[in-house]
Amino acid sequence: CPLFGVILTASYIKNMALVVVGTSECTYYAKNFAYHRQEGLDSVYSVAIKESDVVFSAEKKVKKAIKQIIEFENPDAIMVVSTCVPEVIGEDYSSLSYSLEDEVDIPVFVVNTDHFTCNAHIPGMSRSLAVLSTAMKKFKDKKGINILGHRQKNVEETELIKLMKKHNITINAVIPSKCSIEDIQNASKAQLNIVTDMIALDLAKSMKKKFDIDYIYFDKHMDKETITKNYAKLSEILEVDFLSDLGLEPVFVQVR
C-alpha cells in the first residue's frame, strides 16, 4: 500500500507532521506502524472520516486539524496524506497549500496514496519525495551536491559521504534520511544531485526540470561497472579524481 511507503519515507524528515486522511482502519494502522517503527517519537496524526464526511466532504475538518497541529506542535511543514476513500469520492486536497497560504506560514504538501491504482508501497515513497520540490527556492549560484534517496541511518559511514568530505565537497542535503525543511528548501542551490535509490528519481527529474540540476543515478545494486562510470562522471563534473581514491581504472564517459 502506498500509504505505508509515505510513512516509511517522510517520517525521516525533521519536524514535519504527517496528517493521514482516511477511514479509521487506514489511520489506525498508519499511526500504529509509525509509532512502533519510531519508538513513539513519530509525528503522524489522523483525520478519520465518517459517513457524513463522505457525503459533505472532509476538507473543513482537514483544515481545522492542520491549524490545530500548527498551533500546538509548531512543525516546520505538514504533509497531508490522502488515502483510498477520499480519492474514490473525488476529494482534492491538492489546493490546500494555496487556500491556507494566508493562514499558515509553513509548507503544506499533499500526497495521494490510492491503493486501487497501484499494488505496492514504492509509489508512495516516490511521491512523498517528489512533492518536496514544490517548497524549494531558486538560486543563481550553484554549489555542492545533494544525496537523494538514502533512507537508512548513519549516512556519514557511507563511502560516498566520506569521499565528499575528504575533498571538501559541500553536501547541501541528504533527502530523506538526514534533512530538515530548511535543508529541503535550499537543496536547489546544489550543482548536482546524486540519486542512490530509485524512489528519488522523480524528485531528481523534477529538480532537473525546475532548476536545471543534473543528476547521477547510482542505484543500490552492487555493479562495479555502473559504480565506476558514475564515479567517473562525478570526477568530471566536480573536478575531483575519485577513481584514484577508490583504486578504480579510469573510464571514458559522456557527461550530459
Regions found by a protein language model. Give the residues of each.
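An N-terminal assembly and electron-transfer interface module characteristic of large anaerobic redox
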Residues: 1-256
